[in-house]
C-alpha cells in the first residue's frame, strides 16, 4: 500500500486528541492522591512502625513514563527496602531472569528467611508488606479535596494494589501498585511469582530482576532531543497502545510487549522523528515492525538475552496477530478503520 504520511499524520493527531490524551485535571488528581494517601499516609505509617526500613520510592510504569492513555487512573511505585550493612548477595537461579537473595546479619528480615538465609519473596510481600499496608489503610484519615474516598487493598502479581474509590458512585479514582523491592548496586529485584511450566521445589525463594527504573529513564526522556528538536515518540506509542485495544484491531499485546518492541524499533538509527509527517511514517513503520516480530514469532526481551516475550502466547494466537497486522498494513480502508 502506498503511504500518504501527511494524511495519516493528520488522522493520527485527531485520533490522539479524541481517544488517547489524558486531561490535566485527572493527572493532577492522580498526583495529589499519591501524595495525600500513598506517600503521606501508607508509606509514612510503614516508615514509622516497621523495623524494616524504606530507603526510597521509584516511580515507574506508564503514568510516570508519560505513556498513560485515556485516563490517569493507574500508578506504579517501587518501594525500595533498605538493606543491612553487610548487604544482599545475589545468587543466580536456574530460571532466566530470576535470582535468590541472601542476607547476612539481617535480623529485620529473619522472619522472612529460609534456614540458609535466603529471603522468601512471597512471605515478605504478604506477611510483612501487605500486612503493613492493610494496617495503614485501616488508619487512613480523609484528605481534602478528595476526602470522600475509601481504600481497598488486594494482591496483584508482585504488587500490593491499593484502589482509591469515590464513595457513593464507586468510581475508581486511582489504582496504585506498590511493589516491595531490593536494589543491589544498579539492579532491582521484585517478588514476582514464577509462572513457568517447569516444576520448582523452592520457587518461593525466587526474585524477579526488573528493569522498570532503567526503562523509565529511556521512555520518559526519549523525546528530549539534545538539539532541542523533540519528537513524536511518546504520542506514537500512546496511540499504538490505544489502537491495539480497539475491538476492530484486537491484539492481545499489553504495555509490556509494546514497550519492548518499541525500544527495539527506536534503537534504529535511521528514523525521522521531527518532520511534519514523522508521526504517520513511524506509525506505519512501527506496525510493520510488530508484524515482522509476529511473523517470525520473535520479540526478544530488551534487557535479557535468550528470552522471547512471544513465548507468553500460544502459536496460533501469534499467527493470528501477524495476519491481522498484515491485513491492516495492506489496506488503506482497514488502516483508516482502526483510527475511527
From Swiss-Prot:
Binding site for ATP: 62, 74-76, 241, 255-259
MF-aspect GO terms: ATP binding; double-stranded DNA binding; GTP binding; metal ion binding; nucleotidyltransferase activity
List of residues binding Mn(2+): 267, 270
Cofactor(s) named in the record: Mg(2+); Mn(2+)
EC number: 2.7.7.85
InterPro entries, per database record: Mab-21-like_nuc_Trfase, Mab-21_HhH/H2TH-like, MAB21L/cGLR
GO annotation terms (biological process): innate immune response
A Pfam entry, by short name: Mab-21
SMART domains referenced in this protein's UniProt entry, alphabetically: Mab-21 (SM01265)
Broad enzyme group: transferase
Keyword annotations of the record: ATP-binding, GTP-binding, Immunity, Innate immunity, Magnesium, Manganese, Metal-binding, Nucleotide-binding, Nucleotidyltransferase, Transferase
Purpose of the protein: Nucleotidyltransferase that catalyzes the formation of cyclic di-AMP (3',3'-c-di-AMP) from 2 molecules of ATP and plays a key role in innate immunity. Acts as a key sensor of double-stranded RNA (dsRNA), the presence of dsRNA in the cytoplasm being a danger signal that triggers the immune responses. Directly binds dsRNA, activating the nucleotidyltransferase activity, leading to synthesis of 3',3'-c-di-AMP, a second messenger that binds to and activates Sting, thereby triggering the immune response via activation of the NF-kappa-B transcription factor.
Annotated family: Belongs to the mab-21 family.
Protein name as catalogued: Cyclic GMP-AMP synthase-like receptor 3
Species annotation: Stylophora pistillata (Smooth cauliflower coral)
Amino acid at each position: 500500500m502506498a503511504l500518504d504520511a501527511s494524511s495519516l499524520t493528520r488522522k493520527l493527531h485527531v485520533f490522539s486528541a479524541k481517544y488517547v490524551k489524558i486531561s490535566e485535571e485527572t493527572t493532577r488528581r492522580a498526583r495529589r492522591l499519591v501524595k495525600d494517601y500513598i506517600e503521606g499516609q501508607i508509606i509514612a505509617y510503614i516508615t514509622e512502625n516497621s523495623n524494616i526500613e524504606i530507603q526510597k520510592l521509584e516511580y515507574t510504569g506508564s503514568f510516570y513514563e508519560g505513556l498513560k492513555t485515556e485516563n490517569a487512573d493507574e500508578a506504579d511505585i517501587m518501594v525500595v527496602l533498605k538493606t543491612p550493612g553487610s548487604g544482599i548477595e545475589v545468587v543466580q537461579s536456574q530460571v532466566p531472569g530470576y535470582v535468590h537473595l541472601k542476607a547476612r546479619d539481617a535480623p529485620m528480615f529473619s522472619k522472612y528467611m529460609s534456614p540458609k538465609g535466603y529471603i522468601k519473596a512471597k512471605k515478605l510481600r504478604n506477611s510483612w508488606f501487605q500486612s503493613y499496608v492493610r494496617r495503614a489503610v485501616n488508619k487512613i484519615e480523609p484528605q481534602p479535596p478528595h476526602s470522600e474516598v475509601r481504600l481497598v487493598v488486594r494482591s496483584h502479581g508482585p504488587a500490593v494494589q491499593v484502589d482509591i474509590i469515590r464513595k457513593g458512585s464507586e468510581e475508581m479514582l486511582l489504582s496504585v501498585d506498590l511493589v516491595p523491592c531490593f536494589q543491589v548496586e544498579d539492579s532491582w529485584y521484585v517478588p514476582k511469582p514464577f509462572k513457568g511450566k517447569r516444576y520448582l521445589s523452592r520457587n518461593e525463594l525466587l526474585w524477579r530482576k526488573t528493569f522498570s527504573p532503567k526503562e523509565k529513564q529511556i521512555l520518559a526522556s526519549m523525546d528530549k532531543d539534545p538539539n532541542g528538536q523533540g519528537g513524536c515518540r511518546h504520542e506514537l506509542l500512546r496511540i499504538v497502545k490505544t489502537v491495539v485495544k480497539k475491538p476492530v484491531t484486537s491484539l492481545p499485546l499489553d504495555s509490556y510487549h509494546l514497550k519492548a518492541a518499541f525500544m527495539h524499533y527506536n534503537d534504529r538509527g535511521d528514523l525521522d522523528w521531527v518532520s511534519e509527517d514523522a508521526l504517520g511514517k513511524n506509525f506505519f513503520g512501527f506496525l510493520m515492525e510488530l508484524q515482522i516480530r509476529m511473523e517470525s514469532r520473535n520479540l526478544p526481551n530488551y534487557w535479557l538475552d535468550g528470552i522471547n516475550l512471544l513465548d507468553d502466547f500460544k502459536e496460533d494466537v501469534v499467527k493470528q496477530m501477524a495476519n491481522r497486522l498484515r491485513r491492516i498494513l495492506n489496506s488503506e480502508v482497514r488502516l483508516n478503520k482502526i483510527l475511527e
